[in-house]
């Protein structure tokens, strides 16, 4: 009754090939391509939504098949990639790149930092909400056309969370997060904390696996401490309860870590 949906967000990669991009993972590319296909220029040239895809024939550069890169196979060495000599890394043919939506080409949308293009999509609720979530989580510097396989574990986790936030109606969702502060600087951690507080205000619950003492102090309502041991020696609850009580408990690993921090 109290939990409507469980959303697990971990640091596993969100893509394994060049075809997997941030925009495709976020599931907003269909809406973006539809917006381009509805422009007068696209209609005059009879360019449908599929013409603005890198993954199918029609509008993409066939030399690189829409990746913007060409693979160079080397004997006894890892494969190398060079910019496509046909399109110069632009992924699409000239006809498609002549079409603009709100002054932007499809390449502009894919290759410009999210924070600089979010307002282009104010009239598209899903796209705008998703990009806004990315910015709130400190990912405004990413580009939609980036290969998702190149994201760090921390970035991948926040992209997953942004997708979940934009696709879930608030209330009675349970988020399970695995070390979300891993690899984040203090500024990004602060942004992430504000997102968690926002979730809490909207009736959401989060279970977080974390080792960052300051982060735990700031966000936790209830702590379950499994101690510092791992393997066969771990997995035992050494303390639990309100944060103040756990940090004051001399048996707790957080008590010792907190003393070391200061």
Language-model features: where?
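Conserved phosphate-binding elements of NTP-dependent enzyme cores
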Residues: 1-262
């Amino acid at each position: 009754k109290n939990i409507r949906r469980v959303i697990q967000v971990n640091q596993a990669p969100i893509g394994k090939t060049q075809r997997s991009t941030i925009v495709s993972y976020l599931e907003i590319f269909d809406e973006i391509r539809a917006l381009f296909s509805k422009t007068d220029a696209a209609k005059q040239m009879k360019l449908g939504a599929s013409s603005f895809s890198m993954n199918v024939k029609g509008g993409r550069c066939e030399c690189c098949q829409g990746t913007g890169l060409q693979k160079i196979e080397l004997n006894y060495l890892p494969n190398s990639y060079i910019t496509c000599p046909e399109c110069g890394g632009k992924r699409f043919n000239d006809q498609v790149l002549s079409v603009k939506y709100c002054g932007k080409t499809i390449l502009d949308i894919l290759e410009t930092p999210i924070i600089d293009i979010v307002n282009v999509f104010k009239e598209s609720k899903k796209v705008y909400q998703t990009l806004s979530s990315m910015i709130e989580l400190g990912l405004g510097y990413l580009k939609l056309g980036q290969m998702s396989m190149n994201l760090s574990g921390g970035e991948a986790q926040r992209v997953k969370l942004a997708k979940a936030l934009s696709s879930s109606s608030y209330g009675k969702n349970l988020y399970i997060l695995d070390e979300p502060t891993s690899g984040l600087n203090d500024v990004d951690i602060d942004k992430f904390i504000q997102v968690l507080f926002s979730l809490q205000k909207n009736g959401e619950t989060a279970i977080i696996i974390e080792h960052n003492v300051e982060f735990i102090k700031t966000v936790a309502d209830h702590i379950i401490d499994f101690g510092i041991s791992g393997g066969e020696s771990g997995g035992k609850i050494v303390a639990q309860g309100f944060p103040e009580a756990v940090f004051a408990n001399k048996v707790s690993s957080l008590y010792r870590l907190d003393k070391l921090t200061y």
